[in-house]
């Protein structure tokens, strides 16, 4: 059976915005669900309009085993703080490591936003 990992990290950063995007902005983002860990990612994102929801639907329809990672979204604002960036990427990397420990992966689907900027 094909096995893929699914996760994401989305933010539209505006370098001219006066307020940086902090960790709490991903915990309580408004509009989209808050930060999701592997255990809640699939059930929470399935009914949304997030791109991951489409990837989940197709993977499940095709009989692909999904290894959920972590998923984060914050509303548009200033650059993502170093703390938030490092914490979220660490969650994704740790979940990916756990998924690989559980068995081989055939692919990784990461929902990313091309306009994200971090402080560093």
Which residue stretches match the model-derived regions?
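N-terminal amphipathic/basic leader segments beginning at the initiator methionine
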Residues: 1-61
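Short hydrophobic/aromatic-rich motifs at helix boundaries and adjacent loops
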Residues: 24-28, 64-66, 97-104
């Amino acid at each position: 059976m094909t096995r893929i990992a699914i996760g994401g990290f989305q933010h539209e950063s505006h370098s001219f915005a006066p307020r940086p995007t902090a960790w709490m902005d991903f915990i309580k983002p408004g509009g989209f669900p808050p930060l999701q860990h592997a255990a809640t990612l699939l059930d929470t994102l399935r009914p949304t309009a997030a791109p991951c929801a489409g990837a989940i639907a197709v993977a499940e329809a095709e009989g692909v085993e999904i290894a959920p990672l972590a998923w984060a979204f914050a509303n548009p604002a200033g650059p993502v703080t170093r703390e938030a960036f490092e914490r979220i990427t660490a969650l994704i990397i740790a979940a990916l490591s756990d998924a690989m420990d559980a068995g081989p992966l055939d692919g990784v689907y990461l929902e990313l936003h091309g306009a994200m900027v971090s402080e560093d």
